Each structure stands twice: as C-alpha cells, then as structure tokens.
Amino acid sequence: MPELPEVETVRRELEKRIVGQKIVSIEATYPRMVLTGFEQLKKELTGKTIHGISRRGKYLIFEIGEKDRLISHLRMEGKYRLASLNVPMEKHDHLALKFTDEQLIYADVRKFGTWELISTDQVLPYFLKKNIGPEPTYETFDEQIFREKLQKSTKKIKPFLLEQTLVAGLGNIYVDEVLWLAKIHPEKVANQLTESSIHLLHDSIIEILQKAIKLGGSSIRTYSALGSTGKMQDELRVYGKTGEKCVRCGNEIQKIKVAGRGTHFCPFCQQK
C-alpha cells in the first residue's frame, strides 16, 4: 500500500511530467471510481489545463483550470503511468486523462482507489471532514498537541497512529519502522507512554517519513511510483524482517497481529 512517501514521490513525478498538459478527453472502463460522477468529471475537465499537483496526507490533488480540484486516493494498489495515445487500456486500467500526445492511466487491481472532483473552496472543508492530522514536519507536527492526544487515549499505539488523526501519512510499513526506532511496543497503550517516549516517537515519525521521501519511498511487492523505483526498502529495519536479527540488539524480529495488521517488532528493544 502506498504511504505518504510513495504518494509524495508520485506527486513529484506527476508535477514534472504532466503540469501544463491540456486534457483533451477522459476515458473510463470503471466509472464508479469517480465518486462525484464520471459524466460530470468529463464535462468539467475536458479542455482544461493541469496547473499543479499537490498532496495532503495520502491524497493527491490535481489542480485543474481556475477552480477545479481532482482528489485522488490510491488506496491499496492504485498506480499511475504515462503511455502514448495508441496504447490500449489493459485489464486493470480503469481511468485515463488523455492529453495531446500521451495519456495518464490509472490502474488499480482491487478497484479501491477513488477520484473526486471538488472546487478550490471545498478543499479545506473536505480535509477537515476527513480529520487528517498534520503533515510530518517539524513546522506542522506540534509535539505538545501530539502529547496531549496520546495522554488522553487508551488505544494501542500502532492502530492509533494508523488512524491518520494524529499525523498524516503513516501506513503499516512506516508505523513498524517508527515504533522500532522509538523503541515502543506496537501494543503499548497510548496514555502509558512516558514524556521521553512521546518525544522520541514524535521525532522518529518525522525522521522516518522524511528519509523515505528523500529515498523515493519503498518499492516492494507490486508497488512502484509512476514506474520509478524507490530505495527506502533497503533501509527498513523491521518490516518484512521476520526471523532476522535486529540490527540494534541482535535478537530475532517477530511478527504478530495488532488490530488485524501484520506487525513486525523486536521483543527485546520494544518491550511492553
């Protein structure tokens, strides 16, 4: 599943390659992915130019024309790729923005991804309604607010972080990495964390996600960002390392289920 670093990598690639392109037509083999209606999407966007690509958490925002904003969520396995106009859509290709000389195709094996067309003035209310937390930077991710939310909660820390309300963009891979770096057991109850643990967790979230962005995300299993290969998978310390030695203490990495999610951790470094 693409997490914030992978989505940011896609955003940067799209920004380089499609900003300035005019949408000549739009094709869909699975129009239900457009939650706000495919016909309305065609009517509003055909003939307009893409002026920018931004991001909020795991959501991509296509800035089109003066007031249109196309919100794209990749969900589990959504991918974009550029192709020439004469390339037919394949089995798992569901949507395509066609430009003058090429097309941007959206593929999604599970069909979980979504497109939504909203106006510029609806963007802020849209994300407020989603209750998405701040971006993982020192400028936006306030440690005191983070601490207060943790101290009021009896939730287990891993599923709480996955909710996206504390901070934006964490998924299963990077939550495991963050908790390992901060030496916190994934089942630790949030309000049982010490002040020093919360401080380390806050900084670890920023460190891991910013490092992953710098390295272009993780290219594992079926996921790569617009055909590019990230390098963060080479830096993972616990995710996918079941049975291997912890690089910090030498004990064996274990895998358990936490809130239904496969979870990798070191039982020695990350004690309850």
From Swiss-Prot:
Keywords: DNA damage, DNA repair, DNA-binding, Glycosidase, Hydrolase, Lyase, Metal-binding, Multifunctional enzyme, Zinc, Zinc-finger
MF annotations from Gene Ontology: 8-oxo-7,8-dihydroguanine DNA N-glycosylase activity; class I DNA-(apurinic or apyrimidinic site) endonuclease activity; damaged DNA binding; zinc ion binding
Disulfide bonds: none
Family annotation (InterPro entries): DNA_glyclase/AP_lyase_DNA-bd, DNA_glyclase_Znf_dom_DNA_BS, Formamido-pyr_DNA_Glyclase, FPG_cat, MutM-like_N-ter, Ribosomal_uS13-like_H2TH, Znf_DNA_glyclase/AP_lyase, Znf_FPG/IleRS
Cofactor binding, per record: Binds 1 zinc ion per subunit.
Source species, domain of life: Bacteria
Positions of the catalytic residues: P2 (schiff-base intermediate with dna), E3 (proton donor), K58 (proton donor), R261 (proton donor)
Pfam families named in the record: Fapy_DNA_glyco (PF01149), H2TH (PF06831), zf-FPG_IleRS (PF06827)
Catalytic activity, reaction form: Hydrolysis of DNA containing ring-opened 7-methylguanine residues, releasing 2,6-diamino-4-hydroxy-5-(N-methyl)formamidopyrimidine; 2'-deoxyribonucleotide-(2'-deoxyribose 5'-phosphate)-2'-deoxyribonucleotide-DNA = a 3'-end 2'-deoxyribonucleotide-(2,3-dehydro-2,3-deoxyribose 5'-phosphate)-DNA + a 5'-end 5'-phospho-2'-deoxyribonucleoside-DNA + H(+)
Transmembrane segments: none
EC number: 3.2.2.23, 4.2.99.18
Zinc finger (FPG-type): 237-271
Coiled coil stretches, renumbered: none
Residue numbers binding DNA: H92, R110
Single Gene Ontology BP annotation: base-excision repair
Cofactor(s) required, per the database record: Zn(2+)
Family: Belongs to the FPG family.
Protein's job: Involved in base excision repair of DNA damaged by oxidation or by mutagenic agents. Acts as a DNA glycosylase that recognizes and removes damaged bases. Has a preference for oxidized purines, such as 7,8-dihydro-8-oxoguanine (8-oxoG). Has AP (apurinic/apyrimidinic) lyase activity and introduces nicks in the DNA strand. Cleaves the DNA backbone by beta-delta elimination to generate a single-strand break at the site of the removed base with both 3'- and 5'-phosphates.
Subunit note: Monomer.
Protein's UniProt name: Formamidopyrimidine-DNA glycosylase
Source organism of the structure: Lactococcus lactis subsp. lactis (strain IL1403)
